[in-house]
A protein has these predicted regions:
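FAD cofactor-binding and catalytic pocket of flavoenzymes
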Residues: 118-150, 182-185
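Conserved beta-strand-loop-beta-strand element in the redox core of flavoprotein oxidoreductases
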Residues: 39-58
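C-terminal catalytic lobe of FAD-dependent flavoproteins
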Residues: 142-144, 150-156, 162-245
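Short Gly/Pro-enriched turn/cap motifs at secondary-structure boundaries
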Residues: 81-84, 135-138, 146, 201-202
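Central helical "cap/lid" subdomain
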Residues: 57-122
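Internal, well-ordered alpha-helical segments in soluble enzyme and binding-protein domains
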Residues: 17, 21-25, 39-42, 63, ...
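Conserved FAD-binding catalytic core of PHBH/FMO-like flavoproteins
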Residues: 101-111, 135, 143-156
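Flavin (FAD/FMN) cofactor-binding and adjacent substrate-gating region
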Residues: 1-38, 45-46
Length: 245
């Protein structure tokens, strides 16, 4: 990377292919631990002795409500004090030249003014001021570069962030161009072809990276509010159950 003055590297970095890992994890839980998944069944209410769905009542001594992006659903009353909103992101999958190999996930300095662990540091003030001058269009669109290589050789590249109460299902070509520009500025790619584009939505806001609300002794409402769910989900789950006595 021409012009780079420093970098951070983690030897413990691990990643999985979400498209494969999520269904495989569900299959493993069902086969190895007898977990029953009620696919396509909407929960209408949490009751004193369990929960009520569109097909009936399920008895349960404990209930964990993980609403994800459904901020106006069954968890609305519990989440209302935190004034959460949704943010929409854009991402791309690109095919690099044959033989291209990325040895580690790549992120750039824009991430250092977005993620709270870095952005709350006093040093980030000067960095943000410089980025406002050098990459103002990226900051205005909530862009910070993330590049990872999938097992088929393609690169997943992102992402942008636009907050809204009800995000529209439209992606901006201008935003994609800015993301791709940062890709080529950071990674030595002779060329690449865009093979997929998509948008995603997740909740943001609140006082921390995740909310764990305890309405009573038998109910927990858990939602990641920082876009870090894929990285923190297992640790968060362990903390929730470990502290639930």
């Amino acid at each position: 990377m021409d012009g780079a003055v420093g970098a951070m590297h983690s030897p413990h970095e691990l990643r999985v292919e979400s498209r494969q890992a999520v269904p495989r994890l569900a299959s493993w839980l069902a086969e190895a631990h007898g977990v029953t998944f009620r696919w396509g069944e909407t929960v209408l209410d949490v009751t004193p002795d369990g929960l009520r769905t569109v097909t009936g009542v399920i008895k349960a001594s404990r209930v964990v409500v993980c609403p994800g992006t459904m901020l106006t659903g069954v968890a609305r009353t519990w989440l209302a004090p935190f004034d959460l909103r949704l943010t929409q992101l854009q991402m791309l999958r690109v095919r690099p030249p044959v033989g291209f190999h990325l040895t580690a996930p790549v992120m750039g300095d824009l991430s250092l003014v977005r993620y709270r662990g870095y952005a709350d540091l006093p040093e980030s003030v000067a960095l943000r001021a410089r980025l406002e001058t050098e990459a103002g269009d990226a900051l205005a669109n909530g862009i910070h570069l993330i590049v990872v290589q999938s097992s088929d050789g393609t690169l997943v590249v992102g992402d942008s962030h636009h907050d809204a109460v009800s995000p529209l299902p439209f992606a901006s070509e201008d935003v994609d161009r800015i993301i791709l520009r940062h890709l080529h500025e950071t990674v030595d790619l002779a060329s690449c072809d865009v093979v997929e584009r998509w948008t995603g939505v997740y909740p943001v806001g609140g006082p921390s990276d995740a909310l764990v609300v305890a309405p009573d002794d038998r109910v927990r409402v858990v939602v990641v509010t920082s876009g870090t769910g894929a990285s923190t989900a297992f640790g968060l789950a362990e903390d929730v159950f470990g502290g639930w006595r």
